[in-house]
From Swiss-Prot:
Cofactor requirement: Zn(2+)
InterPro entries (alphabetical): Helicase_ATP-bd, Helicase_C-like, P-loop_NTPase, SEC_C_motif, SecA, SecA_CS, SecA_DEAD, SecA_motor_DEAD
Keywords: ATP-binding, Cell inner membrane, Cell membrane, Cytoplasm, Membrane, Metal-binding, Nucleotide-binding, Protein transport, Translocase, Translocation, Transport, Zinc
EC number: 7.4.2.8
Molecular-function GO terms, alphabetical: ATP binding; metal ion binding; protein-exporting ATPase activity
Encoding gene (name): secA
Induction: Repressed under conditions of excess protein secretion capacity and derepressed when protein secretion becomes limiting. This is regulated by SecM.
Gene Ontology cellular-component terms listed: cell envelope Sec protein transport complex; cytosol; plasma membrane
One Pfam family per UniProt: SecA_SW
Localization terms from the record: Cell inner membrane; Cytoplasm
Biased composition (Basic residues): 891-901
Protein name per the record: Protein translocase subunit SecA
Amino acid sequence: MLIKMLTKVFGSRNDRTLRRMRKVVNIINGMEPAMEKLSDDELKAKTAEFRARLEKGETLESLIPEAFAVVREASKRVFGMRHFDVQLLGGMVLNDRCIAEMRTGEGKTLTATLPAYLNALTGKGVHVVTVNDYLAQRDAENNRPLFEFLGMTVGINMSGLPAPAKREAYAADITYGTNNEYGFDYLRDNMAFSPEERVQRKLHYALVDEVDSILIDEARTPLIISGPAEDSSEMYRKVNKIIPHLIRQEKEDSDTFTGEGHFSVDEKARQVNLTERGLVLIEELLVQEGIMDEGESLYSPTNIMLMHHVTAALRAHALFTRDVDYIVKDGEVIIVDEHTGRTMQGRRWSDGLHQAVEAKEGVEIQNENQTLASITFQNYFRLYEKLAGMTGTADTEAFEFSSIYKLDTVVVPTNRPMIRKDMADLVYMTEAEKIQAIIEDIKTRTAAGQPVLVGTISIEKSEVVSRELTKAGIKHNVLNAKFHASEADIVAQAGYPSAVTIATNMAGRGTDIMLGGSWQAEVAALENPTPEQIEKIKADWQVRHDAVLAAGGLHIIGTERHESRRIDNQLRGRAGRQGDAGSSRFYLSMEDALMRIFASDRVSGMMRKLGMKPGEAIEHPWVTKAIANAQRKVESRNFDIRKQLLEYDDVANDQRRAIYTQRNELLDVSDVSETINSIREDVFKATIDAHIPPQSLEEMWDIEGLQERLKNDFDLDLPIKEWLDKEPELHEETLRERILQSAVETYQRKEEVVGAEMMRHFEKGVMLQTLDSLWKEHLAAMDYLRQGIHLRGYAQKDPKQEYKRESFSMFAAMLESLKYEVISTLSKVQVRMPEEVEAMEQQRREEAERLAQMQQLSHQSDDEAAAQDLAAQTGERKVGRNDPCPCGSGKKYKQCHGRLS
């Protein structure tokens, strides 16, 4: 109450920000007459003038009025479009490291030109971030003439571009690209083996379009660059055959472990758990299939990987639905983004889930992957010196933007008052009743000439509505992940009189729906349109535009509520742009996912009290409030998940930053010999300490163990025992010095053979490769630690603190391993003289010729012997990377002979 009274007196924070910025808008407007008098060349020269002023110490903030006035004037000359005052406000908000909430149709693309130009004056580069390649290319090409008129360069960063083209795009003053591509380029740059392979500059200013989609909806999705792991596709197929024998437990709230079914599903947490009956049955089936031995338990340590396969297969069958969570196209499982309804080509689920879905659908199972590098969008975008974003719907998530990204949200007023009519929700008992009511509403509105946009939350739902419309004989367009290519064209013409368009979530975001259709699209379809043809198209469009306005503008129908109010608002926001007429309504049923999981009991109770009959809908403020509360509950839960993910990822992020900084320093120097000499001392000190404890008696020395260790790990064959026998005065300190000196001399002899330059190059390569290999293993270990850390809570320990503590210990151990493995590899490298290499090469050629002759003979001999040979070869067991090495050293294969292969 007190806060409301204070807001009335002093205005809200938003009002105060806008009031301050309106003073600057007045200054910009006052400069307009002077700018209009400048010639084109004088206007262009302003860019060089601004840059010179910045170099002399002026700030960007002091340049805002003049720079914005220059961009506005250039836009009038190049596009014939003048920035509205509200767009100038939006530009200032974006320059202020804030998020600008600007309604659909208010010209966000043109608004972005203002802060992009201003921040590009520094010469450090501006990254404009969009949600897909189409929008990046469209916005770059649309704005290129304006920026080039002002002497700025524009680059487009698309996926699949070669490194030189990417480098050129990043070198431009203003670069357009997608969030994924910027993030992957950052990871790839930190895996480069030479400075020339890197493409990005220092991250300066990011201007994120559809910022809610990228920083909130995608925040839980890490960007991962992965390499192939061991092939286990056959196991996925075998386990997949077993799952259909299991029965789902009907009662969600019954005890997970003692229920009637074989597994229970927690839809809120998206988890699947086996019941005791299910565990018994699945163990029997695994034994029958020969996957597990009789008497073994699925939970025994030897069956951990098998348990992983069973869980993945259960989740694939119980939680993931075709045409909702993914589609199958050209024999490939492609993920569908739950927030936008778009397909995510190239993205794969982790933890074996994608392979389990491939097995379920009977398509080719691709190898599991091992993470080589990863980062979340939350941490990637926080690397920028300056970050800002714009969207039509940010206010509901303002707290999250502020707490995670330190970005304030400013709601920019519309250029014209909003007159869209948002009607109350209608709730039906069943899905079928709801669909029928939607069809009737569409019939009524299209008969009056009103265009209708139907928003669905999945491909499956969009196809259900489409089938019903076809039965009713209503012409319509379907816009979902399956028809991605025609997206912009369908959206542009969705405002035609009586047009019906079905769109999954907000496919088509970024393209305005023009009432009466898009006359520009019609002109673009003609090869060489004459001025008369263009005028006729415009006149026809004006007639259609007026007819649609008279019919009530664009009508939005939501087929169910989304988990987030923001995404519902995005759908509503497609109508009523720039002060146009429009209306919206959501149709719900008690069978909708949100209602079933979060709001069913309260709303069902209300419906029973009101005595609902089939086909009747309930429309009541109580119901709307109950639904809004359910959405808040989900939003709050999702925010907690994202915040928790960030807290855990922050631990990995600190380590990532340290490794990448170290790696970049390593890349930028050509000589790492000083570092090598320093870590050689550390490694030999630690190795000797393990066998000769400091300040210990000779009886405690393990000389044989030390000799063996030096021989195996550093290829140093030193007669330490003889030294001690022959030289009684040889004490611990001089012995240490002699061993280290021997190692240095051996290494120097190798260097003399190959030359200092070659050795420096080799040292740098070994350091980079070892660092990458250990970092990859560390990421996998961190992942395993993260998955099980919540169990520490049962021991009254804080899982987050435990995770921080253990991951730090693992990181420290990794750095020690890095030192050891680098010195070990460099010590063991064999250097050959040129004549030795030539002799070995000659021997290899002779051996190859002999084998070729033998193969020719074997082709003429009988096939049975060849088949037996093949059987013998294929019967050999493949040694896994983490298995003991067959040589008997006791080491893991990857650390022994596996390294040689």
